[in-house]
Amino acid sequence: MYLNKEIDEVIHTLRNTNELKEISFLKAFPYVTKPTRLSKRCAVLSPNSLELESVSVDNTDFYGTGEIRIDLFCPYHLGSPVIFDDMQKIVKASLNDEISKISISAISVDSSCECYVLTAVLGFGYYEKTEDL
């Protein structure tokens, strides 16, 4: 999965933030759907997009933008205001010098999991240097 390193860094930061100890942070696995009723809050991180352009004559330097998606799930019994407070804490803890864009969706409901869902997207500049084979 692309953006593995970046997602791992964000997960590490979030797991080590005291305000977020009651939330489980997971890396998404593509093509796996296992709806289940949630009993606690859960945040799932996954790549959202990656756009690169060659910025060198020899096509070894690429620069562009990447985005990491954070889906926060909060059980109905905790109430919808909790999900907004938790997402605010997650975004605040994720901020660093590389983040250049933040967007947060409207709240939605997932009846199969009996939870509220709120999505944030963190955008950043991305540089990749490849060596000729």
Positions of PLM-derived features:
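Structural alpha-beta junctions
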Residues: 20-22, 95-101
